[in-house]
Structure formats: C-alpha cells, structure tokens
C-alpha cells in the first residue's frame, strides 16, 4: 500500500509540475522584439502592395518619415512641451490631494463617514464631461485643462490610498501606539510604508487616466499640444502626421509608466525580494 501511495503521489506531482510550466514558463526578451518587427514588416508589406490605402493606414516607413519631418520643423517639440507641462502639473496636484484625502479618510472614522460616500458617488462620472463646465468656470486657458487632469488623477489615487491604509495590519498600529508613537510617527513608520504598494497601483492607474484626459482636453480646448496636433491632422486627413502624433503620445505614456515603475522600486525596495 505505501508503495502504491508513493507512486500515485509521484504521478500526481509530475502532472501538476507539467501543468504549472505553462504558467511559469519564461521566454527571452528577443521574442517580444521579434514579434514587433514581424508585425511592422507585415504592416509595411500590405501597405506597399496597395491592399490598404495610405489615407486609411500609412506604412510605418511613411509615418517615420513624417515624424522626422515634424521633429526637424520643431512642430513636435512645441506640442510635446505644452502637453508635458499640463500633464505634470495636473498629475502632481491630483496625486497630492488624492494622497492626502486617502490618508485622512483611511485613518479618521469621521472623515471616512463624510468623505467616502462623496468620493464613491462622484467617481463614476466621466471626467471629460465636466470639461465644458470647467471652461465656463475657469476659462479656456491652462487652468481648466490642468484642473480636469487633476480631477481625473485624484480619484484613483484617493481610493487606492484609502484601501491601502485600511488594509494595514491593525496589530502593527497597536504596537506603535503601545510604544507611545505619535500620530505622525505612526503614519510615517507604519501606515504609509505598508500602504505604498496600493498607492503606487493608484498612481499607475492615474497615469493612464491623465493621458486620456490630456488628449481629450487638448482636442476640445487647446491650440497647441499633442491632442490638438492629432485633431488638426485628422481634420486635414493627413494620416501619416496624425499617426506620428499618436506614436509620440504612446512614447510619452510609456516613459511616464517606466518612471513610475522606477520610482516604485526606489520607494518599495522590499516588494520584489
């Protein structure tokens, strides 16, 4: 009997190990690079063969040529500078206010009762729908665009910070209080470090939201910016320049996300241990 059990358990372990390799298998980085190159070559081929009109889908080589021309003319530089200014200010303001709101509502029962229902009620509203109202209140200048970005950033940061604070082990807080730690010391040494993973998850969500709101705001209420540039060439049906603007926007989002990942590794070095 023991031998049969041993054989059965060994067979079961072998089956589980084989199934787990499907989930745990890793591939070298060149696989990702090769897949992108193959996709671009296929895209170039169907455009060169005339299967798709360049008006609807320009070839990658045509888009790169348009991008280089726009870079040389300074058109991309001016638009990118305006967009970076708006997204950085909006993201910083929204993140700081969201972080403060999440910490306060997460640590104060009264603030939780007052603030949490308001945040949950306002969160589902599409923020871009409020842009005309902000333009009416704040004018068509930079303030309305920065404010709508800050508002979009505020909610994911506030809600994730709140969840991170609520998920902190109460035993750790009790230990800090038993050693006569002040409220600020408890927040700094116990609550904030344990809530950081959730806070950074909120920041990453907010980064995507801020980019979407930036483009929408620039398309509606801006003369300069990547969103305004894309809309301009869309109206003129100059597709290669439109796609060049989309590529710049994609690279901006990628760099923003990489920066947040780097910042997270610096702030939470123990996360990947």
Model-identified regions with their sequence ranges:
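Transmembrane-helix boundary motif in ABC transporter permease subunits
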Residues: 89-119
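Generic hydrophobic transmembrane alpha-helix motif, especially the helices
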Residues: 120-156, 163-164
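Transmembrane alpha-helices
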Residues: 147, 151, 184-216, 244, ...
């Amino acid at each position: 009997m023991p031998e049969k059990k041993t054989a059965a358990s060994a067979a079961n372990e072998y089956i589980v190990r084989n199934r787990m390799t499907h989930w745990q298998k890793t591939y070298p980085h060149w696989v990702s690079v090769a897949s992108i190159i193959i996709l671009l070559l296929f895209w170039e081929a169907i455009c060169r063969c005339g299967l798709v009109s360049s008006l609807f889908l320009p070839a990658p080589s045509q888009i790169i040529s348009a991008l280089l021309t726009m870079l040389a003319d300074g058109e991309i530089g001016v638009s990118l500078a305006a967009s970076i200014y708006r997204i950085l200010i909006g993201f910083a303001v929204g993140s700081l206010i969201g972080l403060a709101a999440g910490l306060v509502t997460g640590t104060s029962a009264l603030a939780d009762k007052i603030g949490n229902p308001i945040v949950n009620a306002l969160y589902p509203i599409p923020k871009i729908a409020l842009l005309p109202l902000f333009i009416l209140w704040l004018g068509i200048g930079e303030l309305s665009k920065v404010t709508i970005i800050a508002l979009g950033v505020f909610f994911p940061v506030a809600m994730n910070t709140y969840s991170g604070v609520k998920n902190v082990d109460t035993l750790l807080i009790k230990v800090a209080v038993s050693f006569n730690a002040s409220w600020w010391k408890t927040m700094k040494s116990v609550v904030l470090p344990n809530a950081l993973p959730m806070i950074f998850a909120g920041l990453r969500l907010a980064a995507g939201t801020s980019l979407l709101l930036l483009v929408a705001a620039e398309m509606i209420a801006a003369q300069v910016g990547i969103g305004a540039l894309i809309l301009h060439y869309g109206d003129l049906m100059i597709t290669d320049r439109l796609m060049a603007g989309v590529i710049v926007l994609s690279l901006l989002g990628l760099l923003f996300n990489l920066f947040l990942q780097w910042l997270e590794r610096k702030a939470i070095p123990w996360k990947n241990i």
